[in-house]
């Protein structure tokens, strides 16, 4: 299994330094959606990493694929959300509210 990355130049540079080769540097939501589609069509890719800000802009493209997509903060830090998506998933799956 390989890991694919879709991100801005700073994020992509970090993952390239870590040795990942399936990386897409994008500058627009359209480029990001196309990169996600290309990574999704590659059977060797099992995990796709992108930034939270890109993820918000291409939510429909991410929701339509079957691979695991992990959203990480970019250089501006994490996006503050009213509901933490991980807490919501745990609460729905287990019935326990994490504080």
From Swiss-Prot:
Topological category with respect to the lipid bilayer: Peripheral membrane protein
Family: Belongs to the V-ATPase F subunit family.
A GO-annotated cellular component: plasma membrane
Key word Phosphoprotein present: no
Entries under Pfam families matching the protein: ATP-synt_F
Protein location: Cell membrane
Any one biological process term the GO annotation gives: proton motive force-driven plasma membrane ATP synthesis
Subunit structure: Has multiple subunits with at least A(3), B(3), C, D, E, F, H, I and proteolipid K(x).
GO molecular function (one): proton-transporting ATPase activity, rotational mechanism
Descriptive protein name: A-type ATP synthase subunit F
HAMAP family assigned: ATP_synth_F_arch (MF_00312)
Origin species: Methanococcus maripaludis (strain DSM 14266 / JCM 13030 / NBRC 101832 / S2 / LL)
InterPro entries: ATPase_V1-cplx_f_g_su, ATPase_V1-cplx_fsu_bac/arc, ATPase_V1_fsu_sf
Keywords for the protein's UniProt record, in alphabetical order: ATP synthesis, Cell membrane, Hydrogen ion transport, Ion transport, Membrane, Transport
Gene this chain is encoded by: atpF
Function: Component of the A-type ATP synthase that produces ATP from ADP in the presence of a proton gradient across the membrane.
